[in-house]
């Protein structure tokens, strides 16, 4: 069986449809050209590569806290999509419940966009997310997680770490941010998305300098707490990226087919509630 025939769930991707859902006027970055990817276009990509489901992540670029494009994709996706919403730290519980009823399974924390200080007062939100059985999808880079890890260690919420925690490969595995990430494995509530290599690798495709970090994460978290993701449609990518080569890459990074099935399918089914 090839990687294209194995059951798969893509756990980090975005949809952009500015013709139907215009970007905010004050958006810092407005995806354009090949960065635009509608739900219909993404569905064709998933069909072509045998991907059963996908977790859509609300982007700060273009839409920020406007989740309508993603919610429309979920509503019309016939059960194929779930979502991670972008919200204010002071969102009320009724609004969170409404998002959950619409197919949202968690909330995005993007310290690479907002900075660490933006989330220093988010402990109350974490508690409320845990009470509603919603998760956090956390994007950090470099040493940011070292500052935020204590808050997540105390909270009872499930956390999905985006893009391997975006370490700096040349800094080595003992860098504070990556060391903090490995330490979070002990909580049993933290999961890692093996994705977004182009966002942190210093080498070009096939990102050989990312592989030691992927292997360290698989060792610390095990395949039962790791997931795969494409990061389609590849915003701000410094080079052309295609879906197929990324699937080939995870086959190379996780060569054991039993472990790979857990990463590609069984773990996201269990954690995100997709049907298996």
Language model features: what each stretch is:
Residues 61-144, 150-153, 193, 197:
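Active-site gating/metal-coordination segments in enzymes
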Residues 12, 46, 70, 99, ...:
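Conserved, mostly hydrophobic/aromatic
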Residues 2-9, 32-53, 216, 221-227, ...:
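Mid-to-C-terminal alpha-helical segments outside catalytic/metal-binding sites
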Residues 8-11, 56-57, 85, 108, ...:
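Active-site neighborhood of phospho(di)ester-bond hydrolases with catalytic His/Asp-centered motifs
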Residues 26-77:
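Alpha-helical scaffold segments that flank or form the walls of functional sites
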Residues 105, 119-227:
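Catalytic pocket-lining loop regions of alpha/beta-barrel enzymes
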Residues 26-35, 54-57, 104-117, 236:
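Glycine-rich phosphate-binding "P-loop"
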């Amino acid at each position: 069986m090839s990687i294209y025939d194995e059951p798969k769930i893509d756990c980090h991707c975005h949809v952009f449809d500015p013709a139907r859902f215009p970007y905010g006027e004050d958006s810092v970055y407005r995806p354009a050209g090949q960065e635009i990817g509608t739900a219909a276009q993404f569905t064709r990509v998933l069909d072509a590569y045998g991907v059963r489901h996908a977790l859509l992540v609300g982007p700060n670029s273009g839409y920020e806290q406007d989740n309508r494009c993603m919610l429309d994709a979920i509503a019309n996706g016939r059960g194929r999509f779930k979502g991670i919403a972008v919200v204010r730290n002071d969102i009320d519980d009724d609004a969170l419940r409404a998002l959950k009823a619409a197919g949202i399974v968690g909330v995005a924390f993007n310290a690479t966009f907002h900075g660490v200080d933006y989330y220093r007062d988010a402990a109350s939100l974490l508690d409320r997310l845990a009470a509603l059985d919603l998760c956090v999808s956390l994007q950090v880079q470099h040493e940011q997680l070292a500052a935020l890890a204590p808050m997540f260690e105390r909270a009872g919420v499930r956390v999905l770490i985006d893009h391997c925690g975006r370490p700096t490969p040349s800094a080595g595995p003992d860098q504070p941010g990556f060391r903090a990430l490995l330490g979070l494995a002990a909580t049993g509530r933290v999961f890692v998305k093996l994705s977004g290599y182009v966002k942190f690798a210093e080498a070009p495709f096939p990102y050989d300098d990312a592989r030691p970090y992927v292997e360290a994460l698989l060792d610390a978290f095990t395949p039962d707490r790791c997931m795969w993701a494409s990061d389609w449609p590849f915003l701000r990518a410094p080079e052309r990226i295609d879906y197929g080569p990324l699937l080939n890459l995870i086959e190379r990074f996780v060569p054991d087919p039993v472990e790979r099935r857990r990463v590609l399918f069984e773990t996201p089914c269990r954690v995100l509630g997709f049907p298996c």
